[in-house]
């Protein structure tokens, strides 16, 4: 099987930005670099936000000092972080419009020290920005600038936002002068388990493992933006989305988080970092109606995006449906699908995705030529470059997941697999209530074994292969949730996870394990030929516990009744494969071995499909 060659990216700037706008953006970047002046947004791990103007002379100490003055926030035992990087003193790596996180060091997180939110004249004196500030000057977000302007005008006229009742996190409909919803805003500090969650799901600081351990609290916002940026030419119809700093009194601040015992007497103005998504009028969502009338092309396009970004939460509630015509009496007319809620995509490790479309008949229809051309035009390397440029806080671990899943998609499409087959290979199975690795994860396990084997047979010369991505910031927090080594041979050898839920405290106590002898590991290593689907049946006795998916919208009300903290509610999620522990040289070799293994895996999957002549969708006509 020929290796997929990464072709040039799609013609033109993403989302059809005009060339002149792109030139203006580059000129803006050059001007910022020459003057050294930048505007950044510093957020504490309790949710307080301050816009800060930097010049060449500023450093980490001066930024902390400003935060201390503005919020009465203790900064002695804290770290200023920028994505994967812990900033020591130099701020030269920090880009204009970047959000930074000031977090207390692990040993000091138990003492919850609130920050005092500036209000009224204090807020105006310490941060002179407007009510809504988009955290980028990229032409990708031009359409949202007008939306933001419309909202600001409405705010001045007294038009108030409307809190969204559904969901586990805080969200707000912001309206224009006519009172019509034009954007939905989700503050990062109101996510599930974040400090200011308005629905009782609290217990964690920003930057700690969240609803899914591989997606940290406060980091779903930039994932929403990443999904929009990766949806080139609006192929999957993701609504325009940006990160913003937004100020309003409607936002929730839990008691103690802003230094006030009660906010009932006077609603205080709060500044938040939030995702800002254009509101799309629609008639219902996919869970409200049968899916058989959904366009094949729309299902395929959304599925292609979900596979690329390893969406772990694609259910009917986050697929909006807009009717294009009535279809006549007794008929269902044409519809348009709008995918939303991408905050649980691009996890830091391979997770079990959730693709509700996987059993829809449309997913079993072969890709069209247009879809195949689109897939083959995707370039994961350039995707990563673009995301680093537009979302400099994104973690390298997330980008590795993007690269791996895009390579898998491209090779599978070339081989002739349909959307359902690709999705099934990425999805884990449960046997007797126990979770097994997906076929994709098994391929990764074997590719890592071959990479390690090549490393042993071809030792590096001194000084070679020293380059390594920055995964230094609190990656041990993810390890403490998953277990420091829960993959490959070691997992099969000695990790029979218990069934049921476990709190974070219990998980941390269960990760202390000794390493196996090399001889034992060699005996337990499984070759690819043994990792077939039939072999998986024999492995179920050694696999881990089941994984509980986030509740759908129609399950929200029951979930909200408990009001339990994160330590009680987080289930144990098994991690079979970790990509971030490889050095850059190892990562390149791993991808080569991974691609070499794909042909036989795809051939076996195709054989299985041909055996199943009664497969769902073969008799459907569209």
Swiss-Prot record:
Annotated PI3K/PI4K catalytic domain residues: 158-459
Pfam families: PI3_PI4_kinase
UniProt GO MF annotations: 1-phosphatidylinositol 4-kinase activity; ATP binding
Region described as Catalytic loop: spans on this chain: 310-318
Catalytic activity: a 1,2-diacyl-sn-glycero-3-phospho-(1D-myo-inositol) + ATP = a 1,2-diacyl-sn-glycero-3-phospho-(1D-myo-inositol 4-phosphate) + ADP + H(+)
Source taxon at top rank: Eukaryota
Residues involved in ATP binding: 165-171, 186, 277-280, 341
PROSITE patterns: PI3_4_KINASE_3
UniProt keywords, alphabetically: ATP-binding, Kinase, Nucleotide-binding, Phosphoprotein, Transferase
EC number in record: 2.7.1.67
Region named Activation loop: 339-365
Stretches the record annotates as G-loop: 164-170
Domain Ubiquitin-like stretches: 38-95
InterPro entries found in the cross-reference section: P4KG1-8, PI3/4_kinase_cat_dom, Ubiquitin-like_domsf
UniProt keyword annotation of GTP-binding present: no
Residues bearing the modification Phosphoserine: 565
Described purpose of this protein according to its UniProt entry: The phosphorylation of phosphatidylinositol (PI) to PI4P is the first committed step in the generation of phosphatidylinositol 4,5-bisphosphate (PIP2), a precursor of the second messenger inositol 1,4,5-trisphosphate (InsP3).
Entry similarity comment: Belongs to the PI3/PI4-kinase family. Type II PI4K subfamily.
Protein's UniProt name: Phosphatidylinositol 4-kinase gamma 6
């Amino acid at each position: 099987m020929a290796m997929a060659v990464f072709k040039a990216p799609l013609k033109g700037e993403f989302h059809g930005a005009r060339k002149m706008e792109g030139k203006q953006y580059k000129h803006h970047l050059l001007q910022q670099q020459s003057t050294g002046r930048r505007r950044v947004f510093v957020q504490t791990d309790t949710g307080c936000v301050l816009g800060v103007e930097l010049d060449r002379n500023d450093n980490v100490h001066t930024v902390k000092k400003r935060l201390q003055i503005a919020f009465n926030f203790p900064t002695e035992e804290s770290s200023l972080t920028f994505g994967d990087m812990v900033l020591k003193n130099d701020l030269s790596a920090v880009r204009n419009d970047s959000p930074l996180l000031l977090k207390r060091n692990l040993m000091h997180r138990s003492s919850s020290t609130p920050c005092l939110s500036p209000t009224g004249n204090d807020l105006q004196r310490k941060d002179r920005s407007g009510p809504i500030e988009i955290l980028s000057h990229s032409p990708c977000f031009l359409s949202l600038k007008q939306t933001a302007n419309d909202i600001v005008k409405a705010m001045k006229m007294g038009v108030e936002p409307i809190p969204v009742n559904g969901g586990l996190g805080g969200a707000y409909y912001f309206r224009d002068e006519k009172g019509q919803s034009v954007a939905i805003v989700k503050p990062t500090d109101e996510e599930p388990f974040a400090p200011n969650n308005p629905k009782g799901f609290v217990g964690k600081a920003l930057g700690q493992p969240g609803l899914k351990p591989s997606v940290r609290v406060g980091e779903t916002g930039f994932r929403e933006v990443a999904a929009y940026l990766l949806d080139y030419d609006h192929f999957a119809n993701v609504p325009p989305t940006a990160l913003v700093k937004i100020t309003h009194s409607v936002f929730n601040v839990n008691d103690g988080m802003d230094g006030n015992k009660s906010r009932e007497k006077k609603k205080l103005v709060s500044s938040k970092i939030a995702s800002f998504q254009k509101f799309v009028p629609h008639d219902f969502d996919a869970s409200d109606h049968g899916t058989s009338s959904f366009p094949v092309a729309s299902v395929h396009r959304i599925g292609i995006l979900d596979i690329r970004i390893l969406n772990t939460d694609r259910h009917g509630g986050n697929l909006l449906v807009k009717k294009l015509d009535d279809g006549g009496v007794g008929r269902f007319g044409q519809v348009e699908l709008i995918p939303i809620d991408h905050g649980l995509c691009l996890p830091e490790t391979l997770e079990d995705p959730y693709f509700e479309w996987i059993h829809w008949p449309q997913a079993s229809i072969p890709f069209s030529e247009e879809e195949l051309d689109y897939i083959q035009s995707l370039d994961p390397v350039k995707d990563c470059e673009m995301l680093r440029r537009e979302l400099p806080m994104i973690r390298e671990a997330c980008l590795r997941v993007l690269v791996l899943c895009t390579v898998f998609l491209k090779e599978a499409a070339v081989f002739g697999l349909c959307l359902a087959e690709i999705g099934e290979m990425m999805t884990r199975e449960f046997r007797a209530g126990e979770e097994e690795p997906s076929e994709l994860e098994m391929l990764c396990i074997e590719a890592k074994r071959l990479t390690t084997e090549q490393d042993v047979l071809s030792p590096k010369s001194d000084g070679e292969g020293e380059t390594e991505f920055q995964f230094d910031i609190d990656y041990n927090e993810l390890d403490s949730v998953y277990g420091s080594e829960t993959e490959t041979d070691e997992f099969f050898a000695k990790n029979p996870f218990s069934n049921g839920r476990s709190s974070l405290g219990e998980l941390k106590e269960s990760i202390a394990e000794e390493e196996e002898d090399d001889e034992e590991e060699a005996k337990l290593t499984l070759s690819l030929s043994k990792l077939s689907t039939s072999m998986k049946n024999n492995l179920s006795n050694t696999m881990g516990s089941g994984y509980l998916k986030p509740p759908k919208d129609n399950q929200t009300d029951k979930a909200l009744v408990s009001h339990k903290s994160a330590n009680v509610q987080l289930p144990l999620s098994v991690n079979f494969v970790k990509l971030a522990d490889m050095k850059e040289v190892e990562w390149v070799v791993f991808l080569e071995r991974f691609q070499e293994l794909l042909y036989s895996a795809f051939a076996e999957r195709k054989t299985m499909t041909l055996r199943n002549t009664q497969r769902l969708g073969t008799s459907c006509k569209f």
